UniProtKB/Swiss-Prot annotation:
The gene is FPR1. It comes from Saccharomyces cerevisiae (strain ATCC 204508 / S288c). The modification Phosphoserine is found at S51. This is FK506-binding protein 1. Keywords: Acetylation, Cytoplasm, Isomerase, Mitochondrion, Phosphoprotein, Rotamase. PANTHER family: FK506-BINDING PROTEIN 59-RELATED (PTHR10516:SF443), PEPTIDYL-PROLYL CIS-TRANS ISOMERASE (PTHR10516). Pfam families: FKBP_C. One of its GO terms (molecular function) is DNA-binding transcription activator activity, RNA polymerase II-specific.
Length: 114
């Protein structure tokens, strides 16, 4: 099931979470993710590192697509977030890894909310 939210960020739900515990602005979230370009080229993966990623959501610590997309997931949920350039790294890109204005695809699993 696909849902398109703010910024044309698309959420494709892969497997459900608990359906009750959703992150709120400022919450510390623990996430496993793999990020790819639209062509499938992987640029980053917490799964490959064997260490989940933590951040405070909704406060500008991560790309805007995560700040608007992650709060739509409940703990345990796995989803694919497709994030257009303006809600990813925009015209700067990420030199050496992500070309300017790239749409990014993240397979994410929300492990924990604190």
């Amino acid at each position: 099931m696909s849902e398109v939210i703010e910024g044309n960020v698309k959420i494709d739900r892969i497997s459900p979470g608990d359906g009750a515990t959703f992150p709120k602005t400022g919450d510390l979230v623990t996430i496993h993710y793999t990020g790819t370009l639209e062509n499938g080229q992987k640029f980053d993966s917490s799964v490959d590192r064997g260490s989940p990623f933590q951040c405070n959501i909704g406060v500008g610590q991560v790309i805007k697509g995560w700040d608007v997309g992650i709060p739509k997931l409940s703990v345990g949920e796995k989803a694919r977030l497709t994030i257009p350039g303006p809600y990813a790294y925009g015209p700067r890109g990420f030199p050496g890894l992500i070309p300017p204005n790239s749409t990014l695809v993240f397979d994410v699993e929300l492990l924990k909310v604190n």
